[in-house]
Amino acid sequence: MSNSRQHQGHFARKRFGQNFLVDHGVIDSIVSTIGPARGQRMVEIGPGLGALTEPLIERLATPESPLHAVELDRDLIGRLQQRFGALLELHAGDALAFDFRSLAAPGDKPSLRIVGNLPYNISSPLLFHLMTFADAVIDQHFMLQNEVVERMVAEPGTKAFSRLSVMLQYRYVMEKMLDVPPESFQPPPKVDSAIVRMIPYEPHELPDVDPVLLGEVVTAAFSQRRKMLRNTLGDYRETIDFDALGFDLARRAEDVSVAEYVGVAQALAAVRKAG
């Protein structure tokens, strides 16, 4: 596989984190994993040169119900519009600022399926942005750096367990679906990739916790990973009765379950409401 940044006459742009998927066997496996069906509301983030776009359109799009795509690179937008016409509705702009809820069906029922080969340089911020639309989403399938996927699905007590693990596992059921080697891309990235499936919990399955407070607690806990929680969560010891929660502060952040972090955030909310 050539290391050239040019593919199909387009130079991959480093500032956009562009690595184009070119292995048709991998593309077929990804599409089979997604399982698109006619008439579904699907959004592709970063369609690039259309490697996934084409088979997705073949399986689900009609002029009345097109595949939606969010693309930042204006050079690619023109090519995609010319190639797919009315079967692809393109939204020019940055996915980090895009209102995905604007594409959902009317009503409260989840209706969106979101897919994409996400730019690795913005993957974590983009995942957190997408979390704000989770109530409108049926599922998400993303190509990401394998290290990020491992952190997303990591169990407590492992080195990969992180702030990203806690915040996403609170909101989604997640599963690593496929490994994708560097040679599947043009130009090949310097890291291994993987496909992850993310299914949002339904409202009745979610714990009653303010995600902002949960994020505050988790960020503090993981701010110095090698230190004990009695140090990183020390500022909360005057307001939260950790003993009453059965929460052992003589641990490190990666040794605490999602449910335990939720419990601390709930206790913090109760204290602040009372105060």
UniProtKB/Swiss-Prot annotation:
<dbReference type="InterPro" id="IPR001737">
    <property type="entry name" value="KsgA/Erm"/>
</dbReference>
<dbReference type="GO" id="GO:0052908">
    <property type="term" value="F:16S rRNA (adenine(1518)-N(6)/adenine(1519)-N(6))-dimethyltransferase activity"/>
</dbReference>
<comment type="similarity">
    <text>Belongs to the class I-like SAM-binding methyltransferase superfamily. rRNA adenine N(6)-methyltransferase family. RsmA subfamily.</text>
</comment>
<dbReference type="GO" id="GO:0003723">
    <property type="term" value="F:RNA binding"/>
</dbReference>
<dbReference type="InterPro" id="IPR020598">
    <property type="entry name" value="rRNA_Ade_methylase_Trfase_N"/>
</dbReference>
<protein>
    <recommendedName>
        <fullName>Ribosomal RNA small subunit methyltransferase A</fullName>
        <ecNumber>2.1.1.182</ecNumber>
    </recommendedName>
</protein>
<keyword id="KW-0489">Methyltransferase</keyword>
<feature type="binding site">
    <location>
        <position position="46"/>
    </location>
    <ligand>
        <name>S-adenosyl-L-methionine</name>
    </ligand>
</feature>
<dbReference type="GO" id="GO:0005829">
    <property type="term" value="C:cytosol"/>
</dbReference>
<dbReference type="InterPro" id="IPR029063">
    <property type="entry name" value="SAM-dependent_MTases_sf"/>
</dbReference>
<feature type="binding site">
    <location>
        <position position="21"/>
    </location>
    <ligand>
        <name>S-adenosyl-L-methionine</name>
    </ligand>
</feature>
<feature type="binding site">
    <location>
        <position position="19"/>
    </location>
    <ligand>
        <name>S-adenosyl-L-methionine</name>
    </ligand>
</feature>
<keyword id="KW-0963">Cytoplasm</keyword>
<dbReference type="Pfam" id="PF00398">
    <property type="entry name" value="RrnaAD"/>
</dbReference>
<keyword id="KW-0949">S-adenosyl-L-methionine</keyword>
<comment type="function">
    <text>Specifically dimethylates two adjacent adenosines (A1518 and A1519) in the loop of a conserved hairpin near the 3'-end of 16S rRNA in the 30S particle. May play a critical role in biogenesis of 30S subunits.</text>
</comment>
<dbReference type="InterPro" id="IPR023165">
    <property type="entry name" value="rRNA_Ade_diMease-like_C"/>
</dbReference>
<keyword id="KW-0694">RNA-binding</keyword>
<feature type="binding site">
    <location>
        <position position="117"/>
    </location>
    <ligand>
        <name>S-adenosyl-L-methionine</name>
    </ligand>
</feature>
<feature type="binding site">
    <location>
        <position position="94"/>
    </location>
    <ligand>
        <name>S-adenosyl-L-methionine</name>
    </ligand>
</feature>
<keyword id="KW-0808">Transferase</keyword>
<keyword id="KW-0698">rRNA processing</keyword>
<feature type="binding site">
    <location>
        <position position="71"/>
    </location>
    <ligand>
        <name>S-adenosyl-L-methionine</name>
    </ligand>
</feature>
<dbReference type="InterPro" id="IPR011530">
    <property type="entry name" value="rRNA_adenine_dimethylase"/>
</dbReference>
